[in-house]
Amino acid sequence: MYDLTGKHVCYVADCGGIALETSKVLMTKNIAKLAILQSVENPPAIAQLQSIKHSTQIFFWTFDVTMAREEMKKYFDEVMVQMDYIDVLINGATLCDERNIDATINTNLTGMMNTVATVLPYMDRKMGGSGGLIVNVTSVIGLDPSPVFCAYSASKFGVIGFTRSLADPLYYTQNGVAVMAVCCGPTKVFVDRELTAFLAYGQTFADRLRRAPCQSTAVCGQNIVNAIERSENGQIWIADKGGLESVALHWYWHMADQFVNYMQSTDDEDQEFFLGQR
């Protein structure tokens, strides 16, 4: 059980409903500090969060997850001045726009990876950090394909691949930073917008989604926090239709098995090099 009491949480999000609802739940967990980085200012939402727990310090930055990593570094240098350290990083920025593939990939995948690459050195135990937890909020169509939202699905598949790769003991045993993902099912906020299919053949289905039964953002946010509290390194969760379940992961091609002779060190020098101790 991961105890959020006293933790310093950094949430990189868009201005959607899941981020706000997740933050509301986090504020009930006696966290010490909450940094919110999102694309749009929302003072009423910040005030609402603060009213839940007055003793929790909340900081806000207007943030574009698609910015260059060099610019991100400047932001997070400032974040660290206020936060001192980060225990939990939540990546929740998302975009579903099949007409704009670049923006979809940059927001959902490239931006998330750049954020992780920027924040990890602050958390890495071998670089003066205290370890911690990275939570990548993704989608159920990052587990199985979507014939309607092809670009969105591809970006979310990438999040799962990145999460599982970064959670490998090769890194975790060194930096002490666990990595997990929560795959959210559709919410009413998601389907209650103009959705465009990747190809015109799928548009009828995209239009019908508006009438589909979906979970509320409040329930989804609660289950994201539930997943965090039950987290283990490398774990993938599904938060859909009001429920939460762990994904049974399967290896089809495991690098350590396929390249067993390469992956096993032959002497101490190779061991130090492979484990990233140089």
Curated annotation (Swiss-Prot):
GO cellular component, one term: cytoplasm
Keyword vocabulary terms for this entry: Oxidoreductase
SUPFAM superfamilies named in the record: NAD(P)-binding Rossmann-fold domains
Record field: transmembrane: none
Hydrolase among keywords: no
UniProt-annotated binding residues for NAD(+): 11-34
Gene3D superfamilies per the UniProt record, alphabetical: NAD(P)-binding Rossmann-like Domain
Entry-linked PROSITE patterns: ADH_SHORT
Active site: 152 (proton acceptor)
Impact upon substituting residue 200 to E: In strain: Persimi42 and Persimi50
Family in the record: Belongs to the short-chain dehydrogenases/reductases (SDR) family.
The name this protein goes by in its record: Alcohol dehydrogenase-related 31 kDa protein
Organism field: Drosophila persimilis
Gene (name only): Adhr
